[in-house]
C-alpha cells in the first residue's frame, strides 16, 4: 500500500525540479524528462522511495529511536517545526550550528543554559535583575531559542535525521555521515544524492511539497511509536498511475533557486 498517491505529489508540485542548467548529473536516475527548461522528477520513483523511507523511520521509532528534522530555508522553517512537534521529534529550523552533532557535549551545555534562562524568565528572576544585565540575558535567551529551541529535550544524538535540501544543509549532512547517523532527505535535481541513505526525489523549494513529504515522515515516526497506521487511506484506494499519462504544466517561477 503506497504511503502517498501520484495525485497528491502532483498537486503539491513535488515533480518540479530546477532549471536544466542547474542540475547535478548524479540525479539523472530520478529524472523523468524536461519541460520548458525545467527538469521533471520521476514521481513513480518518488512514490516507491517515500515508501522505503517511511518503513525505515517507522522501524527506528518502533525501537525507541529519535528523529531530528532539519530545514533552515524559509519555506521549510514552519513545516519542520510543526511536524517535529506533532510527532515528538526534534528540529533545527533557524541555523545549523557547526558541531551540533559532532560536538554534541558542547551543544548540550548551551541547551542547558537555554533551559536555565527560560526558568529564570518563568519565575520572574529575570525581571529582578538590573536593566543592563536583564537586556543582555534576554538577547542571549532569544538567540538560544532560535537556534536550539527545537532540541531542548534531546538528550543524545538522534537515530535518524530528516533533511529538507541537503545542498543547503551540507554541514548537517557531513556531520551525520561522519557519525554514521542515517539520513532521509528531500533531494532536488540540483543536489548530490550520494551522501543520503534514503533519497526522496522531490521539489525542495515549494512549501506544499515540503509539507507533504515532511508530514509523511512524521506519520511514519508516529506509527512506529504508537503502533497505529498513519498512512493515507486515499493512497490505498487509488489505482497505480504512470507519469507518462499525466499532463504536466509549468507555472511561472518554477525551478528558480532561492537566493
UniProtKB/Swiss-Prot annotation:
Keyword check for Ribonucleoprotein: yes
MF terms in GO: structural constituent of ribosome
Cellular component per GO, a single term: cytosolic small ribosomal subunit
Keyword Ribonucleoprotein attached: yes
A single GO BP: translation
CDD domains for the chain: RPS2
Domain of life according to the entry: Bacteria
Protein's recorded name: Small ribosomal subunit protein uS2
Encoding gene per record: rpsB
Amino acid at each position: 500500500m503506497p504511503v502517498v498517491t501520484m495525485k497528491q505529489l502532483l498537486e503539491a508540485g513535488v515533480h518540479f525540479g530546477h532549471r536544466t542548467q542547474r542540475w547535478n548529473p548524479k540525479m539523472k536516475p530520478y529524472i523523468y524528462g524536461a519541460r520548458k527548461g525545467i527538469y521533471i522528477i520521476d514521481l513513480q520513483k518518488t512514490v516507491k522511495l517515500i515508501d522505503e523511507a517511511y518503513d525505515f523511520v517507522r522501524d527506528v521509532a518502533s525501537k525507541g529511536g529519535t528523529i531530528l528534522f532539519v530545514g533552515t530555508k524559509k519555506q521549510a522553517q514552519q513545516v519542520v517545526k510543526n511536524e517535529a512537534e506533532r510527532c515528538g521529534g526534534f528540529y533545527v529550523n533557524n541555523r545549523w550550528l557547526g558541531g551540533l552533532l559532532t560536538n554534541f557535549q558542547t551543544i548540550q551545555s548551551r541547551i542547558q543554559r537555554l533551559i536555565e534562562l527560560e526558568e529564570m524568565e518563568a519565575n520572574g528572576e529575570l525581571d529582578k535583575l538590573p536593566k543592563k544585565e536583564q537586556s543582555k540575558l534576554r538577547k542571549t535567551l532569544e538567540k538560544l531559542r532560535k537556534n536550539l529551541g527545537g532540541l531542548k529535550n534531546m538528550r543524545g544524538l538522534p537515530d535518524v535525521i530528516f533533511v529538507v535540501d541537503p545542498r543547503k544543509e551540507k554541514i548537517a549532512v557531513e556531520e551525520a555521515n561522519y557519525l554514521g547517523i542515517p539520513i532521509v532527505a528531500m533531494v532536488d535535481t540540483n543536489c548530490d544524492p550520494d551522501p543520503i541513505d534514503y533519497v526522496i526525489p522531490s521539489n525542495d523549494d515549494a512549501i506544499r511539497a515540503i509539507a507533504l513529504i515532511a508530514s509523511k515522515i512524521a506519520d511514519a515516526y508516529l506509527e512506529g511509536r504508537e503502533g497505529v497506521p498513519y498512512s493515507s487511506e486515499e493512497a490505498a484506494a487509488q489505482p497505480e498511475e504512470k507519469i507518462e499519462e499525466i499532463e504536466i504544466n509549468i507555472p511561472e517561477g518554477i525551478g528558480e533557486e532561492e537566493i
